[in-house]
Amino acid sequence: VADPIFAEPRLAAVYDLLDSDRSDLDVYAAIVIDELGARSVVDVGCGTGTFALLLADRGVDVTGIDPARASVDVARRKHGAHRIRWVDGDATGLPPMQADVATMTANVAQVFVDDGAWTSTLRAIHAALRPGGHLVFEARRPEARAWEEWTKDATRQVVDCGEIGLVEEWVDVVSFEDDVVEFESPTIFHADGARFESTSRLRFRSRESIEAALTACGFVVTDVRDAPDRPGREWIYLAQRPEHPAAPGAS
């Protein structure tokens, strides 16, 4: 189930305005198109469709999937959205396909707190890729302890959202236990005083844990690189579905 910050229609409608700097996606476009030469991509956790549309603008065939219907509805209303296949649901609901690349941007990979959900997602993505296809995603490095900066004082912002009026939001950590950070993201619409609460949880898995999960789900980890726009804070993982399945008993 998607968090209210993505699933509530009023919040989804202002998401892009509150998070307007998406220069982080330039890194993904360079990897997906320039480095891997992808012609078909499935964007897992596509949200309001910013990255999917960026890829479509460069001629890529894109499928965007997300469990937050309100966010996908925002994506569907954007200019050029008709070029993209939008799917409501999680990766396990992907239709049969043979994509060149699958992506999880914006730390989508961390929302799978439960190991079972994480494994089923990776296996579903593996099945959606053609042999030789790649999965590209990011995850915050737990040793950077990013959550220590998630306080109301450090994150509060008030944004002019045009006809909607001023919208205020912030992030505040509730707890950190067993690699899982729980935090609140209140949003206030100044025009009518409406306040929406949203509580989210993110899993800060170690690099070793993520690589082991990828391997267990049939991927070959081809590269783990420092995120160029956030050095020392995030890893970008590249994993490939092998061209040929491993022989039984092979190690």
Where are these predicted regions, by residue range?
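Conserved class I S-adenosyl-L-methionine
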Residues: 1-37, 39-45
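Class I SAM-dependent methyltransferase SAM/SAH-binding core
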Residues: 49-93
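A short acidic, Gly/Pro-enriched loop at the edge of an enzyme's catalytic core
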Residues: 94-101
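Residues lining the SAM
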Residues: 105-107
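A short glycine-rich, Lys/Arg-flanked "PGG" loop and its adjoining helix->strand segment in the class I
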Residues: 119-131
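SAM-dependent methyltransferase
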Residues: 136-211
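C-terminal lobe and adjacent flexible extensions of AdoMet/dcAdoMet transferase-like proteins
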Residues: 205-251
